[in-house]
């Protein structure tokens, strides 16, 4: 009998600790991470800060505890630990209403009680610190007409008392993912010393923070760089990086281009230059590209230069070492998807020398020690949840040293292998294959095909939302292909799928499925397909093309490309790729699954959240109505209070339960069981 694991029981699975983010103290002796766990009543995930021993000798130690949780740890130069929390300053029962906005809190370096440093009526958002200054930069919003924080608070109180919720828009966009934008406008502020409070905060400018992320302070705190968005017409809106004087708020320069997006700024150790992410904008026939860009922080005449002209993958946000190389050039670390993994890379900005520090796994939240000799990061993989690790800052192909932290003793209900094949055009294709315990020639496992979202994405990291191990615990094998449009396989992989999202990617998915089913430990007669977002689009596309699967689960999926392009939260991107649906109809006619609804015969489970603004609920409703119209066996799992992702613990439990019950009915031939509470 197979060993029971946390994945065999959804309550136990949801209670597993979830590690995210890292912060390193200025002296390099303290490493802090955030760990989410279930609340006592099981209805929320609550974060807490834990200190991890950088040497890996001592067990992790919990630093914070509150009902609201803590996140986003960062250090000040004196060792004070900062974090965000919506915990109340005092018991709300003693007076003030508990409004639950996130504020900036601090823990003294020598220990003691946490105290609130900065609070705003609309909450504190993205923030950062300087390595050699007490200055802090933080994001907060102001209502139109507000002249300062106090005025803003009065205006908010007036809206609350009047019970006004209306938002008057005069520009696009109006929504982003699951957020309604406005009426308050995000701004970037700096404060010379957070201990003095926010009254003296300097306003460095309004920003469209929802669609442009990243803020950095120069080491001495004199400059602030932050991403924002410019442009008024939908097709003109793009992300740029603004550099401002952190003491006065005066803008000094802007990194921008009509053909590119800039974000994720990081200063070099001397504060003179910036390293940013630069993304070429997509067009009708080109899928865009990503690189890292080096430019002067203050000289507007310096257009900058590409740091990775010959690198064929897409780098993530740059992290600049506090110590330059022997020639005085900046040393930049970044991660990038590569062949089903996500290594940490080290780049010398002077020589262009590039080294992959890791051989396997996918990394995030990279931080560098003060002496530049050690790198810390979170490592995950399809078969390993995120955990903090230590790396030598220069050695290639390392196996990282795991540092003791909650959530490391996870036993899996199966194993992981790979499937390889070759596309018709000669492109090498690969996929991960999760095999449940007990699968073999005498007991072949039913197969689930999972197509990832994006579509410019990769199955290369742990997922709590789409865990193949929950499916494996139920006895399924899970095939996780990286077809055309996936990241980590060079620019050619994007280009070969860009002009027909239902063409080459579909062919690749089918080719990898066929290759997997050559194995004698998989049952080709019991198969199903699942996907979310673009993966949901592919689910719908597959449903109109073949009846080979016993069931299809489509989550947050695109159905009618004509209507979708007009109502998604960021239509400019889609129109640049697809054209105006009222003028250039070719791609819509070729790619929209709804035009082929009458072909569908496979039973389908449709899942959608009402607060999904990326793929609005109308897509799920239209699909559901078409399935009913053509009498396709189907069910519709609707979440009125969720967005593109299902995040609330008991909704997550219901998501998995409904999916598994639907599959058991149609793939395994079991009687349908309606989940409890729906």
Label the model's feature ranges.
Residues 46-48, 95-101, 141-191, 238-239, ...:
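Predominantly five- to eight-bladed beta-propeller fold
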Residues 1-18, 52-71, 95-100, 105-123, ...:
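Multi-bladed beta-propeller domains
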Residues 11-47, 183-186, 215:
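Beta-strand-rich domains and repeat architectures in extracellular enzymes and scaffolds
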Residues 481-678:
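Active-site-proximal cap/loop segments of hydrolase catalytic domains
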Residues 41-46, 90-101, 179-184, 233-239, ...:
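Short, solvent-exposed loop/turn segments at conserved positions within beta-propeller repeat blades
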Residues 23-30, 72-80, 127-135, 215-223, ...:
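Blade-terminus and WD-like Trp-Asp/Gly-His loop motifs, strongest in beta-propeller folds
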Residues 404-519, 523-525, 532, 564-571:
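Cap/lid segment of the alpha/beta-hydrolase catalytic domain
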Residues 31-35, 81-85, 137-139, 223-227, ...:
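Residue position within the beta-strands of beta-propeller blades
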